[in-house]
């Protein structure tokens, strides 16, 4: 099972009982239950990451995953039993290759990497908050805050009332 992420719509899915129930049902049949980016928020909301190590997109990852009982790890991808989570979208590729390796071994994984010509060389070393120019990081946080913060704070308030 692969749960993709995104922005506002992803967080809205954390509130959708039908979606969460479907994920819980399918999870009982999977060898791997995975997420890419903020898809881990949905797995968390389904209760599948409680007391599990997990990661997510950098934006408020620690705060949101803790809200669902997960233990945030700052990493490209994290596996904890059958639960595999990746940080951003490009980290999902790395996680997918690690799953292929887990299933089929190094030679097969290398053949997939060759077929994809997967040899990333980004133009800047700035793909995580600790390596990003502080001005760029602040700008991105402000942009995401305008979209996401009201949703996150609303969920936190609901949880405090329970």
Task: Locate predicted features.
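Active-site-adjacent pocket-lining segments in enzyme domains
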Residues: 1-162
